[in-house]
Amino acid sequence: MAATDVTPVQTSALLSSLHDFQRTFNENQRVKKLIKNWNRFLKAESTDTSEIFTVTIQDLAANEIQPGCSIPEDNEDLVTLQASEEALVRIFTGKYNPAHALIDGALAVFCSERDKVKLEAIAMVIWGL
């Protein structure tokens, strides 16, 4: 009889925070008004753990979270957020204002200026930041 592997499953703090963000994002009716006709791929890239996850925002919802990112870097619908895992977790749980993270040099955002404004508005609506 084969032994059952009972090794604890390692969970990612970043992935957990992205699921929290997804739930909060999808439950907020004001966000739905804000993101009308705004379909994007949010790439969360941890600079210290090399973890990458992509959140697909389509049809007024954060629909899925996938490991890695298969979207080409030059795709205009790709929004890349780079920071340490701790900073990303704090940002996606509403504990660290992304605008402050940018000013502090803790966060790098690669997208159009219009998308940066949209992200800031989303943070303000969701967390009142």
Where are these regions (language model features)?
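Feature captures hydrophobic
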Residues: A2-L129
